[in-house]
Curated annotation (Swiss-Prot):
Gene: chi1
Source species of the chain: Persea americana
InterPro entries hit by this protein: Chitin-bd_1 (IPR001002), Chitin-binding_1_CS (IPR018371), Endochitinase-like_sf (IPR036861), Glyco_hydro_19 (IPR016283), Glyco_hydro_19_cat (IPR000726), Lysozyme-like_dom_sf (IPR023346)
Superkingdom of the organism of origin: Eukaryota
Segment forming the signal sequence: 1-25
Protein's recorded name: Endochitinase
Protein family: Belongs to the glycosyl hydrolase 19 family. Chitinase class I subfamily.
Keyword Signal recorded: yes
Length: 326
């Protein structure tokens, strides 16, 4: 005889959904287009919001830190404005496209709206997450070069949007149809691209980015929120960057076979592994590590292990030799 192992609260929730029919759809996660739960609640594997272990446990999809506030007053208690300015020392340089846009207050407001960000684990873990987030996004927006004043890792957040004449980055989908005349090229700290990312990001933060993608380059809080949405949200088969840096991700046997072990390097793999990882040493990965080490030093925390992805297969490359022909 086979017994159902689902917990009673989730069974009751599913039963209510069945009785309510179309009026009671899943609330979050992949079942709801990547939506986040209100009030920082955890999103269960089934797409429901809650704060108990049924929702926030190992199978949780997003905001898995629960609703317990971090000790000491949130993100601002972990990184001061002076340290933030020292990290992003040249972001307001006259030569930087984003001059005056990326402010400390905008970062703090956006960060505090994502429950779980920099609030999981001890103080060192929380600071390390801030360092990792700002490092990865600094690489995406860097204006530095090898001989730049104060070094190449003092020039993060110099750029705001993709340069040149970028395409519209529109991949028509039923769920996220592109708006007429709108382009979904890279904008903001993570350089969010494509309608299928703008759509769920906007839904998660409560703003229509399909019809207003330029908001990512005109409203600094929205801009930071899109990057934090990407950071906090797993996109199968990839874990979230948040879960990796806070130690909540446990690699599978396939991950281990692919060289994907817990550490900063897996975050690089999540963000751009198909281009940068599994190819030996390359300057882009080294640049991401350089930012990270500098920021960890400024925050007074250790780096952890497995910083690079030089020998990691990307999440899009199978370890199964038959996969390519299947």
């Amino acid at each position: 005889m086979v017994y159902c192992t689902a917990s009673l609260p989730l069974l009751l929730l599913l039963l209510v959904g069945l009785l309510a029919g179309e009026a009671f759809a899943e609330q979050c996660g992949r079942q709801a287009g990547g939506a986040l739960c209100p009030g920082g609640l955890c999103c269960s594997q089934f797409g429901w919001c809650g704060s108990t272990s049924d929702y926030c446990g190992p199978t949780c999809q997003s905001q898995c830190g629960g609703v317990t506030p971090s000790p000491g007053g949130g993100v601002a208690s972990l990184i001061s404005q002076s340290v933030f300015n020292q990290m992003l020392k040249h972001r307001n340089d006259a030569a930087c496209q984003a001059k005056g846009f990326y402010t400390y207050n905008a970062f703090i407001a956006a960060a505090n709206s994502f429950n779980g960000f920099a609030s999981v684990g001890d103080t060192a873990t929380r600071k390390r997450e801030i360092a990792a987030f700002l490092a990865q996004t600094s690489h995406e927006t860097t204006g530095g070069w090898a001989t730049a004043p104060d070094g190449p890792y003092a020039w993060g957040y110099c750029f705001l949007k993709e340069q040149g004449n970028p395409p519209d980055y529109c991949v028509p989908t039923a769920q996220w149809p592109c708006a007429p005349g709108k382009k979904y090229y890279g904008r903001g700290p993570i350089q969010i691209s494509y309608n299928y990312n703008y759509g769920p990001a906007g839904r998660a933060i409560g703003y229509d980015l399909i019809n207003n993608p330029d908001a990512v380059a005109t409203d600094p809080v929205i801009s930071f929120k899109t990057a934090l949405w990407f950071w906090m949200t797993p996109q199968s088969p990839k874990p979230s960057c948040h879960n990796v840096i806070t130690g909540r991700w446990t690699p599978s046997a396939a991950d281990r076979a692919a060289g994907r072990l817990p550490g900063y390097g897996v975050i690089t793999n999540i963000i751009n592994g198909g281009i940068e990882c599994g190819k030996g040493f390359n300057d882009k990965v080294a640049d991401r590590i350089g930012f990270y080490k500098r920021y960890c030093d400024l925050l007074g925390v250790s780096y952890g292990s497995n910083l690079d992805c030089y020998n990691q297969r990307s999440f899009g490359v199978s370890t199964n030799p038959l996969a390519a022909s299947s």
